[in-house]
């Protein structure tokens, strides 16, 4: 990770609690400059920088003068994981992303929407039948996220619960040994999915890639793409749904707008994405040549990390930085920017646009079951671990 090596030494670039960036990161945002940091992720003691401004972050992520690949391939133990799109540079990145993007067509998204609606309805039916109070993280966010993403990718329903469990354990288990064991199970299963898809491609995302580009994508790349897309998508969607439900009950006046005005859904989605920023920062980019970012000259070989959390708040500084779905044009970089922007964004947004309004209409009096009890959060990026709601 990056540690400060100048007067800002000791500053944490993670949020401290809930959705607040914390005073140290806010101070960097107020200064409006790139901060020098020391990189331990690459050899030779590279100079590292932290970008906290919205425009600076977009400039870094959208520039072809930075490399994602050098960070992984340029370390003593580093190597590129086949199929992991975030580790590639053009032209390899262009080739692989084009193949995967062919499965995210507008038509495929449109045809898949009824399945999302069915999953959401079944989940809400189950919650309503149980009666409150209900923990909406394991009963609402994770079931919808897991089922939708797995259905889209072609994971059989009978395998989805176990796959979700091992994927979550591979990231959240406090024991390193258990994390590794869960990760191995996850990779083994995804390898089986890739092999089966190669033999018999179905009517799903992986099947579409094999049918259209089977001769151009290697077995290792297919496995990597499968593991990468599943790993990146499930967590993101679950985080958005958990946080979206929490923000609904914390802001009843804006909950009412969402419930009564269908046209407010896109604004709600954009503001949740901006305010939540589930992935707080990017992996570092390595400068391929000297380049000026804002007022700062970044030299060839320097590493730049972009704080998505700070960049999303930079345009709306405190005290105006509050959750507000009526905000004008709440632009954000939560899904990244440039050639590495999130490929699954249309699917994630479709799930959110379907699930959150359905939740609001099914339970118009949704509220915290224990208003005085603090919401349980995990370690950074502070995922909502439990959200007990009633209606």
Curated annotation (Swiss-Prot):
Cofactor(s) listed:
heme
Binding residues for heme: 342
The record's listing under Pfam families reads: p450
GO MF term list? heme binding; iron ion binding; monooxygenase activity; oxidoreductase activity, acting on paired donors, with incorporation or reduction of molecular oxygen
Question: Which InterPro entries does the annotation name?
Answer: Cyt_P450, Cyt_P450_B, Cyt_P450_CS, Cyt_P450_sf
Cite the entry's keywords alphabetically: Heme, Iron, Metal-binding, Monooxygenase, Oxidoreductase
Q: Please tell me whether the keyword Metal-binding is annotated for this protein.
A: yes
Lineage: superkingdom = Bacteria
Bilayer-crossing regions:
none
Pathway membership of this protein? Answer: Antibiotic biosynthesis; vancomycin biosynthesis
Note down the stretches annotated as region Disordered. Answer: 1-22
EC class, as a word, reads oxidoreductase
Q: Nuclease as a keyword?
A: no
User: What does the UniProt function comment say about this protein?
Assistant: Involved in the coupling of aromatic side chains of the heptapeptide of vancomycin.
Protein family (similarity comment):
Belongs to the cytochrome P450 family.
Q: What name does UniProt use for this protein?
A: Cytochrome P450 165A3
- Organism of this sequence: Amycolatopsis orientalis (Nocardia orientalis)
């Amino acid at each position: 990770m990056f540690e400060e090596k100048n007067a800002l030494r000791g500053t944490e670039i993670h949020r401290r609690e809930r959705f607040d960036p914390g005073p140290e990161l806010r101070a960097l945002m107020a200064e409006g400059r790139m901060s020098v940091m020391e990189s331990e992720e690459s050899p030779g003691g590279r100079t590292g920088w932290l970008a906290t401004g919205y425009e600076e972050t977009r400039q870094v992520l959208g520039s072809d003068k930075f490399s994602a690949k050098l960070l992984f391939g340029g370390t003593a133990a580093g190597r590129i994981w086949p199929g992991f799109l975030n580790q590639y540079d053009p032209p390899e990145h262009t080739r692989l992303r084009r193949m995967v993007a062919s499965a995210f067509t507008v038509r495929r998204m449109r045809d898949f929407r009824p399945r999302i609606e069915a999953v959401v309805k079944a989940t809400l039916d189950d919650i309503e039948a149980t009666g409150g109070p209900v923990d909406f993280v394991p009963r609402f966010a994770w079931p919808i996220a897991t089922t939708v993403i797995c259905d889209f990718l072609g994971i059989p329903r009978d395998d989805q619960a176990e796959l979700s469990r091992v994927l979550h354990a591979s990231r959240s288990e406090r024991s390193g040994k258990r994390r590794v064991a869960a990760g191995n199970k996850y990779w083994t299963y995804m390898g089986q999915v890739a092999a089966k898809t190669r033999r018999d491609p179905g009517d799903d995302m992986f099947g579409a890639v094999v049918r259209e580009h089977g001769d151009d994508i290697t077995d290792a790349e297919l496995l990597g793409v499968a593991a990468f897309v599943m790993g990146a998508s499930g967590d993101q969607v679950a985080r958005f749904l958990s946080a979206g439900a929490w923000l609904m009950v914390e802001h009843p006046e804006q909950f009412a707008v969402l419930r009564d005005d269908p046209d407010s859904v896109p604004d709600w989605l954009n503001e949740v994405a901006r305010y939540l920023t589930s992935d707080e920062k990017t992996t570092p980019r390595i400068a391929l040549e000297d380049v000026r970012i804002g007022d700062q000259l970044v030299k060839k070989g320097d590493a730049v990390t972009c704080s998505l959390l700070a960049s999303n708040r930079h345009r709306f500084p405190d005290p105006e930085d509050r959750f507000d779905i009526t905000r004008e044009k709440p632009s954000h970089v939560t899904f990244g920017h440039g050639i590495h922007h999130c490929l699954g964004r249309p699917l994630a947004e479709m799930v959110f646009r379907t699930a959150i309004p359905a939740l609001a209409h099914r339970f118009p009096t949704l509220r915290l079951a224990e208003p005085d009890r603090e919401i349980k959060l995990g370690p950074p990026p502070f995922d909502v671990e439990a959200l007990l709601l009633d209606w």
